[in-house]
Structure formats: structure tokens, C-alpha cells
Amino acid sequence: MKAIIPKYNEEGSKIIGKQEVEVIGQVKYIGDTDPLSFVDGKIYNVIEVIGNSIRVIDVIEDYLYMFDDPTINWKGINGKFIVVNDFTEEKLLEKLQNKFKNNK
């Protein structure tokens, strides 16, 4: 599965075109709705796993969030991601989800 996101210059300050990226999975956001960022029940495409964080696409932009607490810095907004589809052979998203499930 592919998605199109903006391509930025080296400094990351200006959009210089578009780029096609591979979608490696999908997560559902469960929690408080913030109209500018998250909607309860919405499914987001994941394009990268970086440590304990995932890069998700929201409409056309991509954002990096901590998997276990994506709303950590937002006052009054609480939520989490649940893996809906993991397209990776290594099941990277499922392993990340299980890592936090086992720690609670």
C-alpha cells in the first residue's frame, strides 16, 4: 500500500514536491477528540517505526508520535493507538503494541 506525502528541503522548512511512501500498517486512535489532531475511532496509516514512536499520516502530512502515549504533551487530551493492520513481515507494529501491553 502506498501513500503520497510532502517532500521537504534538507532543512525541513519548505515543501519542494511530493513523495510516495510505503504504508507499513494502520493504527486506530482511541481517546479524547482534538479537532486539530486526533479523532476518536479514526484510522491512521503508519509509514515508519522509530524506537517507541511511529510516523503516521494524517490527511497529507506525516507526524511522529510515541506509540504508547501519543497525547503525552497535550493538556486535557488523552488517548492511545491500537494496531488494526500490520503489513510488515516482522510484525513491527504488533511487537511494539505487545511491548507496552506487557509492561502494564
Regions found by a protein language model. Give the residues of each.
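Intrinsically disordered, low-complexity regions
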Residues: 1-2, 13, 18, 54, ...
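Exposed, low-complexity/repetitive linear segments and helix-based recognition motifs
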Residues: 17-19, 45, 55, 59, ...
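Intrinsically disordered, low-complexity, charged/polar segments
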Residues: 63-100
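Glutamate identity and glutamate-enriched acidic tracts
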Residues: 10-11, 19-22, 48, 61, ...
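Basic/aromatic-rich interaction segments and small domains that mediate binding to polyanionic partners
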Residues: 2, 26-74
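Mixed-charge, Lys/Arg-rich low-complexity intrinsically disordered regions
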Residues: 1-32
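Mixed-charge, low-complexity intrinsically disordered regions
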Residues: 10-11, 98-104
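Short glycine-aromatic motifs
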Residues: 13, 21, 27, 44, ...
